[in-house]
Amino acid sequence: MTPRTWPRSDLKLLIVDDDPNTRALLSEALEGRGACVRASASAREAQCTIMGWHPDLVISDVGMPRESGYDLIRRVRDLPADAGGRTPAIACTGYARAEDRARAMNAGFDAVVAKPVDLELLVDTIAQIVPHARGLAAALPPEGA
């Protein structure tokens, strides 16, 4: 089975999680697929990165101290488009009940991926949300081929 990959540095992803192990794991896995990845330990740091770096997608934990991922995405959605206000976002969370998913979507997330993260599901979700990732993923041979 060939994992989906993106041309190096073509896809800019921001990982937001207060847990350093989760940040490292996701960063390493997605960089290994060719994405350019930055990581933030807090919602405040992430907002600055979004405004300055303009990632293609944010993957954020929702249960962080001080400010949650919900708070982050609500603030991001209030930004002008040229400051990152339309940046797509995936909630990456251990809260996986239907009401938790609904809360994430109502906050402004585009999708929800449960922890522990299934990397293939995360990659597929990225490909569904980010237009140029979708095109690149579609050009790859089907899994198992």
Could you say what each language-model-derived stretch is?
Residues 90-92:
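Hydrophobic/aromatic residues positioned on beta-strands within the core alpha/beta folds
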Residues 19, 58, 62-63, 95:
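The short loop immediately C-terminal to the conserved phospho-acceptor aspartate in CheY-like receiver
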Residues 42-45, 68-74:
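Acidic catalytic/metal-coordinating carboxylates
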Residues 34-41, 49:
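Short hydrophobic/Thr-rich beta-strand motif most characteristic of the beta2 strand and flanking loop
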Residues 24-28, 32:
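Charged docking surfaces used in two-component/phosphorelay signaling
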Residues 127-145:
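The C-terminal output helix
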Residues 117-126, 138:
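C-terminal output helix
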Residues 23, 65-66, 97:
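The feature encodes the CheY-like receiver
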